[in-house]
Curated annotation (Swiss-Prot):
Keywords: ATP-binding, Chaperone, Coiled coil, Nucleotide-binding, Proteasome. Residues 1-23 are annotated as: Disordered. Belongs to the AAA ATPase family. Pathway: Protein degradation; proteasomal Pup-dependent pathway. Residues 587-588 are annotated as: Docks into pockets in the proteasome alpha-ring. Pfam families: AAA, Prot_ATP_ID_OB_C, Prot_ATP_ID_OB_N. This is Proteasome-associated ATPase. GO terms for cellular component: proteasome complex. ATP binds at G276, C277, G278, K279, T280, L281. ATPase which is responsible for recognizing, binding, unfolding and translocation of pupylated proteins into the bacterial 20S proteasome core particle. May be essential for opening the gate of the 20S proteasome via an interaction with its C-terminus, thereby allowing substrate entry and access to the site of proteolysis. Thus, the C-termini of the proteasomal ATPase may function like a 'key in a lock' to induce gate opening and therefore regulate proteolysis. Consists of three main regions, an N-terminal coiled-coil domain that binds to protein Pup and functions as a docking station, an interdomain involved in ARC hexamerization, and a C-terminal ATPase domain of the AAA type.
Length: 588
C-alpha cells in the first residue's frame, strides 16, 4: 500500500510502466478528482473549526467568570476572617475602668479614687499630668494606670451647700435626708462664687461636687432684675407715691440725717386696697426709682438695686418646714445683696396667702410656723440693713396682726379706687397725642390734637362717673336693713381703665379694616365703657357677698343681700339676688 502511494506521488500509474501515456492520463484524472473532492470538503471543515473555536471561547469566558467569582469569594472570606479576628481580639481585651483624679505627685504618679479605693497609679506618657484637674474623670487600663483624660461627671445627687470650710477646697453640705457631709470642691467650682443654700451636684462615691444646679423652687420665686417701670407711668396715685418714696428712698439717700435725728428707718411697707388699683405697679416702680437715686448719689452712670419678687402662693409647700426654709433663703439672699451697700426690695405679692392670722381656723394652720419665721427675719437677732420689705394685699384683714404692728410693716398705704380726677390722670397714660385720631374728632377741636385727647378723656370720665340709670350696678342690703345702690364708679380701677382704652383701640382698628376710617373716636371710648361695665355683671357671683365686698374695698356695715341691677348685653334684665351664708363672721 505504501509502495502504491509512492508510485502515485511519483506520477507512475500502478501496473504500468512510466512511459505509458494512457496510464499517466488516467492517473492525473484520478488525482484531479481527488483534489476536487478535497476542495469541495474544505469549507465544511472550516465551519467546523470556527464553531469549535467559538465553543472554546464561550467555555473560556465561563471559566474566567467562575474563576473571578471564586477569587471574590476568597477575598470576602479573608476579610471576614480578619474582621472576626479583630472582634475576637477586641472582646478578649480586659475591661477599662474609670476613676476620679485627686492630686498629682512629684514623682509623676497620680492619686485617684476608683472602686471605693484611693490608689496611687502611673500615668501614660500620652496624658499630660499637669493638665489634669481636681475631680476630672480618668480612663484606666487593666493595670489601673491612667491612659486617657475624660470630662467631669454630669450626673449625681443634689445636695444643699451649708458652708465652705476654711481651706476653700472643701464644703459642708446637707443631703435630702438632712444628713450633713463634708465634700471636695471640683476644679470648676473653685473659680465660681457659691452661696449657702445653693444646690450642688454631688458624685457620692468620690465625694466631689461639680456644679451649681439651678433650683426652680427658689430661682422661679425670686426676680432679681429691676423692673423698667417709673413713677411717671403710674396715674392717679400721687399721694401714695409720695408716701412710699418717703418711707423707702429717704432713709437710704440721707442716712446721716436719720442718724442725727435718731430716727429709725421703716423696715416694711404694706400696700393694701382693692384689686387692680396699682399696688404691684408701685412696688415695681420703687426699685427702679431707688436705682436711679443711687446713681445720682454715687455719681455713677447707672445705679444698682435689687427687687426680690416673692410669689406668695408658689412659696407654699406640702412638706413641713419647706416654706420656712425658702423664706430663710430669700432673706439670706437679700442680706448678701445688701451687704454690698446695694438697696434690696423684698416684695411679697398676695401677702395674705402666706401670712394669715394664726389660730383663725380658716386654713390648715400652716401659718403657725410661717408667720414667726417672717417675724424673726424682719426684726430678729440678725438685723436687716438696706433691706425693705413691701407687702401687697387686698385682704389686709386676714394678715396676722403681729406682722402689721409698728416696727415690722411700719408704713401702711391704702391704694384707693380712682376718683374722677385720678381717672383722668390714668386715661392720660394710655390716651396720648401719638395715637391715630379720627379727623372728624380732631376737626371738632380746631385741629388741636392735645385738646382732642383732653376732650375724649373728659367725656369718657363723665360717663363713667355719672350716677345715671345705666350705670347702676348693685343694690346691697345691710344687716340693719338699710339699702344702697352702688354704681360702676364705686368699683372702678386703673386696670379697668386700661382695659377700656384697649377695647376702644381695638374698635378703631376694626373700623379701619371694615370701613377704611382710620383713627380713634370718642364714640369708641363710650362704647368701650358700656361693654366693660356689662362684661363685669358676674363679678359679685359668690355665696358670701360680705367676703366679696371686703375684697372689692367696700367697708361698713355687714352686707347680707346683693341684687345686681345691670342690664344684660342683649337688653334683657339680668338682675340677680345673692344671699349671704349664716354667721359669716365678717363685719365691714
Amino acid at each position: 500500500m505504501a509502495a502504491h502511494d509512492d508510485d502515485m506521488n511519483r506520477g507512475i500509474r500502478p501496473g504500468r510502466g512510466s512511459d505509458d501515456p494512457a496510464g499517466q492520463i488516467a492517473y492525473l484524472e484520478q488525482e484531479i478528482a481527488v483534489l476536487r473532492r478535497k476542495l469541495a470538503d474544505s469549507p465544511r471543515h472550516t465551519r467546523i473549526l470556527e464553531e469549535r473555536i467559538v465553543e472554546l471561547q464561550t467555555n473560556l469566558a465561563g471559566v474566567s467568570a467562575q474563576n473571578e467569582r471564586l477569587a471574590n469569594t476568597l477575598r470576602e472570606a479573608r476579610d471576614q476572617i480578619v474582621a472576626l479576628k479583630e472582634e475576637v481580639d477586641r472582646l478578649a481585651q480586659p475591661p477599662a475602668g474609670f476613676g476620679v483624679f485627686l492630686t498629682a505627685n512629684e514623682d509623676g504618679t497620680a492619686d485617684i479614687f476608683t472602686g471605693g479605693r484611693k490608689l496611687r497609679v502611673n500615668v501614660s506618657p500620652s496624658v499630660e499630668l499637669e493638665e489634669l484637674r481636681r475631680g476630672q474623670e480618668l480612663m484606666l487600663n487593666e493595670a489601673l494606670n491612667v491612659v486617657e483624660a475624660m470630662e467631669y461627671e454630669s450626673v449625681g445627687d443634689i445636695v444643699t451647700l451649708k458652708e465652705i470650710l476654711e481651706d476653700g477646697e472643701r464644703a459642708l453640705v446637707v443631703g435630702h435626708t438632712d444628713e450633713e457631709r463634708v465634700v471636695r470642691l471640683a476644679e470648676p467650682l473653685l473659680d465660681v462664687t457659691i452661696r449657702p443654700g445653693d444646690a450642688l451636684l454631688l458624685e457620692p462615691r468620690s465625694g466631689y461636687v461639680y456644679e451649681v444646679v439651678p433650683k426652680s423652687e427658689v430661682e422661679e420665686l425670686v426676680l432679681e432684675e429691676v423692673p423698667d417701670i417709673g413713677y411717671e407711668q403710674i396715674g392717679g396715685l400721687g399721694n401714695q407715691i409720695e408716701m412710699i418714696r418717703d418711707a423707702v428712698e429717704l432713709p437710704y439717700l440721707y442716712p446721716d440725717l436719720f442718724k442725727e435725728h435718731e430716727l429709725r428707718p421703716p423696715k416694711g411697707v404694706l400696700l393694701y386696697g382693692p384689686p387692680g388699683c396699682g399696688k404691684t405697679l408701685i412696688a415695681k416702680a420703687v426699685a427702679n426709682s431707688l436705682a436711679k437715686k443711687v446713681a445720682e448719689v454715687t455719681g455713677q452712670a447707672t445705679g444698682k438695686s435689687f427687687f426680690l419678687n416673692i410669689k406668695g402662693p408658689e412659696l407654699l409647700n406640702k412638706y413641713v418646714g419647706e416654706t420656712e426654709r425658702q423664706i430663710r433663703l430669700v432673706f439670706q439672699r437679700a442680706r448678701e445683696k445688701a451687704s454690698e451697700g446695694t438697696p434690696v426690695i423684698v416684695f411679697f405679692d398676695e401677702m395674705e396667702s402666706l401670712f394669715r392670722t394664726r389660730g383663725s381656723g380658716v386654713s390648715s394652720d400652716v401659718e403657725n410656723t410661717i408667720v414667726p419665721q417672717l417675724l424673726a427675719e424682719i426684726d430678729g437677732v440678725e438685723g436687716l440693713q438696706n433691706v425693705v420689705v413691701i407687702g401687697a394685699s387686698n385682704r389686709e384683714d386676714m394678715i396676722d396682726p403681729a406682722i402689721l404692728r409698728p416696727g415690722r410693716l411700719d408704713v401702711k398705704i391704702k391704694i384707693e379706687r380712682p376718683d374722677a380726677e385720678a381717672a383722668k390722670d390714668i386715661f392720660g397714660k394710655y390716651l396720648t397725642e401719638r395715637l391715630p385720631l379720627h379727623t372728624e374728632d380732631v376737626g371738632e377741636h380746631g385741629g388741636d390734637r392735645s385738646a382732642t385727647v383732653h376732650g375724649m378723656i373728659q367725656t369718657a370720665v363723665e360717663q363713667m362717673y355719672a350716677e345715671s340709670e345705666e350705670n347702676r350696678f348693685l343694690e346691697v342690703t345691710y344687716a340693719n336693713g338699710d339699702k344702697e345702690v352702688l354704681y360702676f364708679k364705686d368699683f372702678n380701677s386703673g386696670a379697668m381703665i386700661e382695659n377700656i382704652v384697649g377695647r376702644a383701640k381695638k374698635m378703631a382698628i376694626k373700623d379701619f379694616l371694615e370701613h377704611s376710617q382710620k383713627g380713634l373716636r370718642v364714640s369708641h371710648l363710650l362704647q368701650a365703657c358700656v361693654d366693660e361695665f356689662k362684661e363685669n355683671e358676674d363679678l359679685p357671683n359668690t355665696t358670701n357677698p360680705d367676703d366679696w365686698a371686703r375684697i372689692s374695698g367696700k367697708k361698713g356695715e355687714r352686707i347680707v343681700y346683693i341684687r345686681t341691677l345691670i342690664t344684660g348685653k342683649q337688653g334683657a334684665d339680668t338682675g340677680r339676688s345673692i344671699d349671704t351664708v349664716a354667721n359669716t363672721g365678717q363685719y365691714l
